């Protein structure tokens, strides 16, 4: 009689009920970070785990916490800190799914909802609290209706971002309210020295550390590509690349990243006005709107999501086939997080990043050095880009007018002021500082532009990349700024399958008086 092989999760020390639940979820084996970190956490060690995006980091800490919670089901057993609303809700969902058999209670504290409602949920004795630092600090300083006296686990997810200094004030308040005898678990896509040297959360001397060994920071199943554009036709290049991809992959899910909240909203409106259904996700949206947008995308009701970097970290949407960088991330690390939304858990995926030639070559060189991989050029029909130039420009202008009519800038200012007031800061003083920063930023952008116009590739990295075989044959004249006489492709050179609106017949112009007289004659 053939001996039945033990379940991989059972070997790690998890109870049969939890192993059975994981089997129901279709998980056949543990990922490397789960194999290494789960036994260490169950053994009572502090843990620092680093692995690529999509490697199963959430279950690496959620499973051992649920295992121990089933032995001692007390309230406020574990606290998970995370930097974004969306990630907080995703982590809570994974706790609920894995702990369904034991009836685990999870509370999300992330702002965007009524603080009194959150307070009531915290009073209902949840087992797990998943929180953003700022809102949890507000609860801890504003009321004493709950405590973390029973806390056994503190988890800091996306630790490289959480401990970089931006959240220190809130984290210090939280630390003072937590018991000293607990396990500290830190998880991130990258291992950083400052995690071990954190002055806010002390790390035990016997802390277990594990980092995924790889020279390549992105997964092998990810096909990474680039597109070159000029300053004036980035939107056209994006739309044509999206149109072509949709022709071949009609039911694929696509995430498009851009850098600012306003442009995220503007790009979303522009695509909608061109009959490309999409939802957007950015920080100025209400929490209900953000959750609804993400739910529609996750459930495949809408196949295109346009987002800022609030969606770049940690979000697990398994069915994303393509990530597009409409505007490039500011650092190679953020690039890794963005493209990590696709090709997750062994699946294949593609990323297409749009680089302005030659000004973005320095960033391309930095990204390729960081990921130890060369990007390949994505094919695009330049004649089609030329053809839709006018339509996209006009549609974007219409969208800008709609955005101005909706008082987007005024609502953004009100949002900032409300946030500063809640943080106990002087809104007028903070607004003055904000405007000064914006002016300095604009001045720096203009300075860089002057350098780039004076010399196409100002940095040594950019100069070296211009000598790369990929760019030697590039016609730089194509990327120079053109005026009113901008050339457009002729009808004979144009492909026959453009965007939907491009195929619509133009309305017949009404005849003027002169035309009517001619007809009568």
UniProtKB/Swiss-Prot annotation:
Which family would the database say this protein is a member of?
Belongs to the DEAD box helicase family. DDX49/DBP8 subfamily.
**Native species:** Drosophila melanogaster (Fruit fly)
- Report the residue ranges where the short sequence motif DEAD box is annotated in this entry: 157-160
Instruction: Check the record and name the PROSITE patterns matching this protein.
Output: DEAD_ATP_HELICASE (PS00039), HELICASE_ATP_BIND_1 (PS51192), HELICASE_CTER (PS51194), Q_MOTIF (PS51195)
Q: Which domain of life is it from?
A: Eukaryota
Q: What does this protein do?
A: Probable ATP-binding RNA helicase.
The segment(s) forming the Helicase ATP-binding domain are: 38-209
Motif Q motif mapped to chain? 7-35
What taxonomic classification does the UniProt entry list for its organism? Eukaryota, Metazoa, Ecdysozoa, Arthropoda, Hexapoda
| The protein's Enzyme Commission number | 3.6.4.13
Q: Catalyses which reaction?
A: ATP + H2O = ADP + phosphate + H(+)
**Gene Ontology molecular function terms on file:** ATP binding; ATP hydrolysis activity; RNA binding; RNA helicase activity
This protein is called Probable ATP-dependent RNA helicase Dbp45A
Question: What biological-process terms (Gene Ontology) are attached?
Answer: regulation of alternative mRNA splicing, via spliceosome; rRNA processing
